[in-house]
Amino acid sequence: MLLAKICGLSEIVHVEKCIEYGASMCGFILFYPKSHRNLSLDKAKELTSLKHSKSNVAVMVQPNKSQLESIKNLNFQYYQIYGDQDPDEINKIKKRYRVKIIKALTIETREDVLKYKKYEAADIILFDSIGKEKSLSFDHSLLKYVPTNIKKMVAGNIQIQDLEKISKIMDIIVDVSGALETEKKKDLTKIKEFLLKVKEINENRTI
């Protein structure tokens, strides 16, 4: 099955639209002021207070203890972590805060993909482009080196026209943000169209 995580959400109406049209996860960027999608803690608390059955994801780069402590009482089911943390540190974060972990790896080569083996504690491995928010992609065929029992997420300039091809590689979660924006703001029409396309692909696969 193809699932979708919509990342970089910053307004209640956008979260509501994601919930309405079937996103599996809603992502919120924290402690990363370089990004126009970065949220204050107050805003993150507001956006994650909505009652729904989807998963809220705190997206962070190399979070420190103080930052992790500051969000421990917010309604997050997953922490998505970028950076070069030791696998033991990832395991400690998971146990201490009782959350599921999405470990992000930046991908350029096969060797980058194989780094997933280090992070046994991660619930999901995110394979992202080296550009992070710079709208770059990577060769998705590299994911053939990852066993099917590893739960996978893919990011990096994913467009609506890419969904059919990605869905044929394997069951996967697509992590999308910039493709659903107009002038650096989430576009409700683009969110709707993207999520309806995901739904269409899944329905066609069951026929």
Language model segments and positions:
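Conserved N-terminal beta1-alpha1 strand-loop-helix module at the mouth
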Residues: 1-207
